[in-house]
A protein has these predicted regions:
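Short, conserved phosphate-binding/catalytic loop or strand-edge motifs used
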Residues: 76-78, 208, 226
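Generic structural signal for well-ordered secondary structure
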Residues: 11-15, 38, 52, 150, ...
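Hydrophobic alpha-helical scaffolding
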Residues: 45, 49, 155, 159-163, ...
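Active-site- and interface-proximal helix/loop "cap" or "latch" segments in soluble metabolic
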Residues: 98, 102-206, 211, 233
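Aromatic-residue-lined binding/catalytic grooves and analogous aromatic/hydrophobic interfacial grooves
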Residues: 210-238
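Structured, non-membrane catalytic/scaffold regions adjacent to prosthetic-group chemistry
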Residues: 47, 51-71, 178-194, 201-208, ...
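Terminal low-complexity/charged segments
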Residues: 1-123
Length: 238
């Protein structure tokens, strides 16, 4: 299950269709399925397919459609006009168990997120993550487009995945139009995507080293990441 969301269908609140995107590894394909119109509630799939839990929570939060039988139904980003609000966090009981709350403001230059740890000594028993502090409603800006600002919006969805999001959006438009990008463009996209991947993976390795206070490796990875980030200048001048 790659994606699952709801599309409003009519003026009645809580009405719409569910759209799911499924990936099949056997033949490397994606399939899009759409449900019949529904209102108010539907049987939760999380009970049998755990990967659906976050999607169902988001559909409930955005459209008020209740997944009946969902084992842990609570907001993803907002509740009662306050954002974000993750509801009640999972808690582990025990005399030696302590809770650690981290974020959303962090010491490093990263996007905000709240992390709730349940620990017993040095052992982390459970981690729950609350995101969405920078949710900007990009999805709702897309209908009726593409607009002049659409590609810029795609490039700024996530700062470290500019090429990935821009390429994904371009390929969606090409598929809808029945068009195919020139071979040269496909090669340039592949090259840019690989450079972005290398920069991110090297940055992650440096982050792991920094988290365990192994600073020489962290510094080396930072330098190498900078080299990868500068290489696109040779390709497109930026």
């Amino acid at each position: 299950l790659c994606a699952w969301f709801a599309v409003p269908d009519g003026a009645e609140a809580g009405s719409g269709r569910r759209v799911a995107v499924l990936a099949f590894d056997a033949d490397n394909t994606l399939v899009v399925g759409r449900s019949l119109p529904f209102t108010r509630s539907y049987p939760s799939l999380t009970v049998t397919h755990a990967q659906a839990h976050l999607f169902e929570r988001e559909v409930w939060e955005q459209h008020g459609v209740i997944p009946e039988g969902h084992p842990w139904l609570k907001p993803v980003r907002s509740s009662a006009g306050t954002a974000p609000a993750n509801g009640t966090f999972f808690r582990v009981d025990g005399a030696e168990v302590h809770e650690v709350a981290v974020g959303p403001i962090h010491a490093g230059i990263i996007e905000p997120g709240h992390f709730r740890f349940q620990c017993a000594g040095e052992e982390v028993l459970h981690l729950e993550i609350a995101l969405g502090y920078q949710h900007r409603g990009v999805e709702r800006a897309l209908p009726g487009g593409p607009h002049r600002a659409t590609m810029s919006q795609m490039e700024t969805v996530s700062g470290d995945a500019t090429i990935a999001h821009a390429t994904a959006y371009a390929t969606v438009l090409e598929a809808l139009c029945g068009a195919e990008a020139p071979l040269r463009s496909q090669w340039l996209r592949a090259l840019a995507l690989e450079l972005e991947r290398l920069a991110n993976h090297v940055g992650d390795l440096g982050g792991l080293a920094n988290d365990v206070a192994f600073l020489p490796t962290a510094a080396a990875c930072g330098k190498i990441r900078g080299d990868f980030l500068n290489l696109p200048d040779l390709v497109c001048g930026n």
